[in-house]
């Protein structure tokens, strides 16, 4: 009976991040990660039949106590840039921020233009980590552009109240799928810089052993052209564990649609605490660059190439 419940539990996708990163929030209840509550809400009385080792594993892999220590402690009440900065402190994340303009490295972001004259940018980056990179990039851009930024992100992140005001949720197939185009339009029409990870997934390790983003989606090209936004390419250093890449590789080989590797992102974030990452911003690419000589998809891969070129040491 227990095995049947366990299999049913998996088949019903009750371990998807939408449920694990819940705001289990009725009025007056704090936002917290609560695996026991998730199981009880979804399985009812059958929740007691879920193997205890599985419940313990979920709590461990998601670092439930550690995350709740911040969400219900120092992070409580913080919003936007303050929440991002607090998250970086929690992660003990150190950043080397620089620009690479025409092969010349310069510390800081003084070489980047501001938003004077209503000039707002589309800022695109590779996505090597899935945790620190998103938090750090948001913090950097908030400080540079006076919090005038908005993420286009997976809608599970809307559950983090401190982050939500900076986010436009992406869920093309869920309840908000019908409103997705309108929300993207609103972001690009706004007086904020739009931050995107065009791959939509964390970087993967290829058969050649190289860790790189999958193909980038073309949305940032088409919308940047439509709304006359120059594109700022960003390279973020770092990588996850071999375990993460091996899980992702085997899921692909076995044609498993559920993104099991995503379950491990909280653990990867935990393991990457205390590390130093280099964040390199390139020169803004004029929106007029993206002409008819390439398709939007081809231009997206071209920009992706420019991002990885930023990681190469100037001569």
Ranges and model annotations:
Residues 13, 18-121, 134-136, 164:
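Membrane-anchoring hydrophobic helices of lipid-metabolizing enzymes
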Residues 178-315:
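Non-catalytic C-terminal accessory region of glycerolipid acyltransferases
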Residues 93-100, 176-178, 262-263:
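Short gly/ser/thr-rich secondary-structure transition/capping motifs
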Residues 98-102, 152-154, 170, 284:
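Conserved beta-strand termini and adjacent loop/short-helix elements that scaffold enzyme active sites
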Residues 121-175:
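Catalytic core of membrane glycerolipid acyltransferases/transacylases, capturing the structured
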Residues 88-95, 170-176, 209-210:
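Short, flexible loop segments at the rims of nucleotide/cofactor-binding pockets, characterized by
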Residues 2-3, 12:
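Polybasic, lysine-rich low-complexity intrinsically disordered segments
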């Amino acid at each position: 009976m227990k095995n049947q419940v366990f299999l049913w539990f998996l088949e019903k996708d009750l371990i998807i991040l939408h449920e694990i990163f819940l705001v289990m929030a009725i009025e007056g209840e704090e936002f917290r990660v609560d695996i026991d509550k998730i199981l009880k809400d979804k399985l009812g009385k059958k929740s007691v039949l879920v193997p205890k080792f599985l419940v313990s594993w979920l709590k461990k892999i998601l670092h439930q106590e550690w995350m709740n220590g911040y969400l219900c402690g120092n992070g409580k009440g913080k919003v936007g840039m303050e929440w991002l900065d607090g998250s970086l402190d929690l992660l003990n994340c150190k950043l080397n921020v620089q620009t690479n303009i025409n092969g010349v490295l310069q510390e800081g972001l003084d070489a980047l233009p501001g938003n004077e004259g209503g000039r707002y940018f589309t800022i695109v980056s590779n996505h090597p980590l899935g945790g620190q990179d998103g938090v750090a990039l948001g913090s950097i851009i908030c400080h540079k552009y006076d919090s005038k930024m908005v993420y286009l992100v997976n809608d599970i992140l809307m559950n983090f109240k401190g982050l939500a005001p900076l986010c436009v949720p992406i869920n093309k197939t869920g309840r908000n799928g019908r409103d997705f185009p309108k929300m993207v339009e609103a972001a690009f029409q706004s007086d904020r810089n739009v931050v995107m990870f065009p791959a939509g997934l964390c970087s993967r390790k290829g058969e050649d052993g190289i860790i790189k983003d999958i193909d980038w989606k073309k949305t940032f090209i088409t919308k940047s052209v439509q709304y006359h936004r120059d594109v700022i390419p960003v390279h973020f250093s770092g990588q996850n564990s071999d375990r993460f890449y091996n899980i992702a590789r085997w899921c692909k080989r076995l044609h498993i649609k559920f993104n099991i590797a995503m379950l491990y992102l909280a653990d990867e974030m935990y393991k990457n605490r205390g590390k130093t990452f280099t964040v390199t911003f390139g020169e803004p690419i004029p929106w007029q660059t993206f002409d008819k000589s390439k398709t939007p998809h081809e231009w997206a891969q071209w920009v992706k190439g420019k991002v990885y070129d930023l990681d190469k040491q100037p001569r």
